[in-house]
Swiss-Prot record:
Belongs to the universal ribosomal protein uL4 family. It comes from Phocaeicola vulgatus (strain ATCC 8482 / DSM 1447 / JCM 5826 / CCUG 4940 / NBRC 14291 / NCTC 11154) (Bacteroides vulgatus). This is Large ribosomal subunit protein uL4. One of the primary rRNA binding proteins, this protein initially binds near the 5'-end of the 23S rRNA. It is important during the early stages of 50S assembly. It makes multiple contacts with different domains of the 23S rRNA in the assembled 50S subunit and ribosome. Residues 44-79 are annotated as: Disordered. The gene is rplD. Pfam families: Ribosomal_L4. It comes from the Bacteria. GO terms for cellular component: ribonucleoprotein complex; ribosome.
């Protein structure tokens, strides 16, 4: 699949790049995508949730009534989970939600996500660029020139670029990622991928 290379003014440079079929042209595997996104979302959780159980709450431990002969059900103390205002049973405890996912599955998931974007013609290749200073105006101008101002976009750079990152930081529908940290969730969460030429080479090197 060939894609025209544009500059940040939205103009065609006259060059084309070929998207690697083994990365951008595979049959997407939805289950691999599900597992990778599930792991990503699980890793975002703090896992610090906690509720006090019967032995931890404040309250009297006096038995409410005699064991037998009262005519009603047996009663312990007022902390009993059976009673209104009593303790929580099997409440949440701090835990780590991380789970293992094989590298092959993660790679397949990223390839599947990129293939979906290629099928939707939602990948724009731009020549490598940088901003002389962090200016939101410059980033907005680029987005307008590429005619994607109404899209949620992910800009993929070959390496961290402070000026570009700061220029995009205040744009609600824009995110910036480096090629080596590209993940399935970010790819799928964006409506359009804007990938620089060197980023494309880096992605192909990583996923080949």
């Amino acid at each position: 699949m060939e894609v025209n290379v544009l500059n940040i003014k939205g103009e065609d440079t006259g060059r084309k790049v070929t998207l690697n079929e083994s990365i951008f042209g595979i049959e997407p595997n939805d289950h691999a995508i599900y597992l990778d996104v599930k792991q990503f979302m699980a890793n975002q959780r703090q896992g610090t949730h906690k509720s006090k159980e019967r032995s931890e709450i404040s309250g009297s431990t006096r038995k409410l009534g005699r064991q037998k002969g009262g005519g009603g059900a047996r009663r312990g103390d007022i902390n009993s989970p059976v009673l209104v205002g009593g303790a929580r049973v099997f409440g949440p405890k701090p835990r780590d939600y991380w789970f293992k996912l094989n590298k092959k599955v993660k790679t397949l998931a990223r390839k599947s996500a990129l293939s979906y974007k290629a099928q939707e013609n939602a990948i724009i290749i731009v020549e490598d660029f940088t901003f002389e200073a962090p200016k939101t105006k410059d980033f907005v101008s680029m987005v307008n020139n590429l005619k994607i101002a109404d899209k949620k976009l992910l800009l993929v750079l070959p390496e961290a670029n402070k000026n570009v990152y700061l220029s995009a930081r205040n744009i609600e529908r824009a995110n910036v990622a480096i090629a080596s940290a590209l993940n399935t969730y970010n790819v799928l969460n964006a409506e359009t991928l804007v990938v620089t030429e060197n980023s494309l080479k880096a992605i192909e090197n990583i996923l080949s």
